[in-house]
Amino acid sequence: MRIEEDIKLGFKDVLIRPKRSILKSRSQVNLARCFSFKYSASIWSGIPIIAANMDTIGTFEMVKSLSKFNILTAVHKYYSFEEWKNFVCLSSKEILNHVIVSIGTSNIDFLKIKKIFLLSSELKYICIDVANGYSEHIVSFLKLVRDYFPDKIICAGNVVTGEMVEELILSGADIVKVGIGPGSVCTTRVKTGVGYPQLSAIIECADAAHGLNGQIISDGGCTVSGDIAKAFGGGADFVMLGGMLSGHKECSGDIIEEKSKKYMIFYGMSSVSAMQRYEGKIAGYRASEGKTVKIPFRGSVDSTIRDILGGLRSSCTYVGAEKLKELTKRTTFIRVTEQENCIFNAFKE
């Protein structure tokens, strides 16, 4: 047993210090990024936000809406091959270029993804989707996928420490997904006692990845656009959103009505709801590590995305970053004990 004495930080523990700026308007800020990758020869450009590969969020409908903003969607792994076939046949090149195909680590998953990628050469991204990226099994599976798909952009995770980021990149990952337990419907940290505050995980993992010409995705923990800015400021190349995109018509799940108000169900992928839906039961050796909540129905995701991007542009303006790429080097975090004045929060409509 050992104890690390350094205090690790989450988004709520810091604010970004404002700095002198020559920008006159938020409209001058360019949020697009352009990345080359360690293994794939592809070049990616767009806004580096990704809809999470949760079954309620990473839907084909979400792909169609977010592609208009040049934003990626990690499509969940529970669609059948026939559903993929129908989607690919009916989708344009522009839409397919914004799809990340998520898979598990079983032989069935590997056979399925081989069939999916035969449907179109416009599919370029793979996400190996497991909760615990520290397993030897994911490393061996990642090597298998990289050998079979040498030209695809592959991300793998989830991890929260630099040494495992390095291991995954050296095993074939272009991008590593960072985050254990920060999600809005994740209870891993309280159920297992395992995790890592997200901002510190980003800072440490980004340093490890960038030293090997890799990238990271910050996955989880963002509740407002300011958190997204902090993730980019800490060194994240991409930010993945789940809860912030929940409750929209592009999400899967039924709309329920109670007392004249509409809601959608949102749950973690290790929750009782998810396990019963896809496995029919909770395995005797498992415990739920997620929660199920009702989210007020919010209509189209378009207005939420515009609000997020507007907040991100404003963050850049406050520190003088004309491009999102400049935000990290323009960021100075200050430790704080408060984030906002909450006196009237109870009166919000």
Curated annotation (Swiss-Prot):
It comes from the Bacteria. The active site is at 186 (thioimidate intermediate). Its EC number is 1.7.1.7. The keyword Transmembrane helix does not apply. K(+) binds at residues 181, 183. One of its GO terms (biological process) is purine nucleotide metabolic process. It catalyses: IMP + NH4(+) + NADP(+) = GMP + NADPH + 2 H(+). One of its GO terms (molecular function) is metal ion binding. One of its GO terms (cellular component) is cytosol. It holds the Pfam family IMPDH. Catalyzes the irreversible NADPH-dependent deamination of GMP to IMP. It functions in the conversion of nucleobase, nucleoside and nucleotide derivatives of G to A nucleotides, and in maintaining the intracellular balance of A and G nucleotides. This is GMP reductase.
